Amino acid sequence: MARIFWFRRDRRLQDNLALNSCAAAAIADGDKMVIPVFWFNGSDFENLSGLRQHSLTESLKALDESMGSNLEVIDSPDMGALAAYATSAKVRFIHATESFDPEGIAEQRALASKLKGTGIELVLEDSYYAVKPGTVAKPTDGSAYRVYTPFYKAWFQIGWSAPAKLTKGFDWKPRSGKSKIPSPTKSAPFKVKAGEAFALETFRRFQSRAIGDYSENRNRPDLSGTSHLSHALAHGEIHPRTLLAPLSDLDGHTVFRKEIAWREFYADVLYRNPHTLDDYYEPRFKAMRYDTGAKAKSKLERWQSGTTGFPMVDAGMRQLLTTGWMHNRVRMIVASFLVKDLHLEWQLGAKWFEQNLTDFDPASNSHGWQWTAGCGTDASPYYRVFNPILQGYKFDPQGNYVRKFIPELSHILGPEVHEPWLLVDGLQNGYPEPMLDHSVERDESLARLEEIKVK
């Protein structure tokens, strides 16, 4: 009797422990058949940006091709269709990688509920992380870590298994004629590359070209100093174990390992505090005075479109719209600007990122925003307000990043591009004046913080 493997955010064949378990069980059953299935909600798919739609589609195409075009795709608003498919396929087991974020947990519970009385068991194993969320805890009382550094030390001490190769000796069940990969309903400005093979190639390129200087260059958006693997991790086209396995104690390797651990830390925090997906980790910040109404909506739209008049902010927002990705340093800059210069709630920015980032990860997105907003675990203090102009001079010293994404400023050849309003011809191509005075809004932000301080 065949077994179903439900692909989720683990769209790869290598180093997939849950898939290996499913394959081994199918071999032991004597049937040797595995039915690969992917479930998605077409309504949710429709709400994604064009780049996110294309990103998912290309990821699924690559997965499908890697298994001989046998992936069964189920489009349904709920888990009933997956349960019905399993019943019609006459299987007794559905295997999957366990999810630890609120949406993934809800999917698991919904499917288990639909399977009640069918005789079909849902088998959940492994996770999307090197160490399962909820595992790392203080040795004194078993409680969770609120601060990253001690979490990292405990996480590193626990360790992880070596990457596992795909189990041999099983077969994919041929796909039915009805199933097909979803087609994007929105356009994208370029062809998105995705899939396990591309992820492994990207990692090899990073190892050979950039990891040695990662510590120095990772904060420079004008350089290709990062791994560009966040998309692959978000889709599960590569597992963190694969990235961690070859790392040594060299400086660049250590810093890269610590960046992977930030992803694991945020996953742990969200698992233990599921309400923080869209609510404050530090509840007192709910009382912060944020701007609302028509004026706030107008400010949000200028931020979203990259027309604030602050080049570093606008370059980041335009990079997001044109590529579906944004450099991590710039994510912090635009987040600080939204919360502390525009006085808007972090959830508005997090939602925009969710709609547009091809590397969207629920835990990293929510808690990355809360870190910058000063209301999360181990957060940057609220009174730390990024100066978007100085950040530009520091991390894009020649202005190459800004010129790449803001063509209206391409005529300004040096670092002066970060303050074009100071030049006679700086705004001649229609780039807007700054929409606010940063020093004034910084003071306003700190004044609002005083209002919620515990007396």
Please provide the spans of the model-predicted regions.
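Glycine/tryptophan-enriched, flexible segments
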Residues: I120, D141-M288, F395-D396, N400-K455
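Generic alpha-helical segment signature
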Residues: L56, E196, G306-G309
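Trp/Phe/Arg-rich N-terminal binding region typifying the photolyase-homology
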Residues: M1-P163, G252, R318, S364, ...
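Short, contiguous strand/loop micro-motifs
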Residues: W6, G50-L51, E98-S99, S215-E216, ...
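Active-site-proximal binding-pocket segments
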Residues: S224-L247, D251-E408
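Hydrophobic alpha-helical segments, especially transmembrane helices
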Residues: R9, R109, E264, V330-M332, ...
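Short secondary-structure transition/capping segments
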Residues: D78-K90, K114-L124, G169-P182, G376-P381, ...
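Short coil/turn segments at secondary-structure junctions
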Residues: W6, N47, L300, N429-P432
